[in-house]
Amino acid sequence: LGDVYKRQVYVAALGHAFGPNSERGIFKSIDGGVNWKKVLFVSENSGAADLSMDPGNPRVLITTICQAKRSFWRLDSGGPESGIYISFDGGDNWENITKNPGLPEGLKGRMGVSISPAKEGRIWATIESEIDTGVYRTENYGKTWALVSDDQDLQGRPWYYQHIFADPSDENTVWVMNYSCHKSTDGGKTFELVPTPHGDNHDIWIDP
């Protein structure tokens, strides 16, 4: 992500898949990528899985941290360090909002987030959790949340996909990507399948 007017660039680094390492978290550059500073680091076992910037205010950032470890015979996705963090000052300071009202309790796995360009304060999240996995929404920059869909088709292989994307022009349209492409036009209440050339949908971008 980047604020092109100030040459600020942000990178969400998930880190090494097979063991602990320090190259995880959120990194920030203020000179177009020449130099970098780590601005959010949870631990050597947990990295940043997703990152979203508010197009209306690029100082607002939200990220998800995923505790995970992969080996040749298994994948452990989730743990007590997984969570959601938000910054209102361009990444200088971060607040852990994982336990804010409305979010699911219990251990979290991989999560995706997307700030709506069409409605101030609205953020979408798709959350892998041992309790109440689903799509969540906030209208006040993460202070309180509500579960808007517990459709398990939206959680296909969440440790592998887990991407959500807010439509840039319609506040009630949101996309969820996994082995299928899902689209909602009613604020997340219902989703329909959108045909794609291949059943492996990791990301989406819409020209604003």
Question: Across the structure, where does each feature detected by a protein language model lie?
Answer:
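Beta-propeller blade termini and top-face loops
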Residues: 3-208
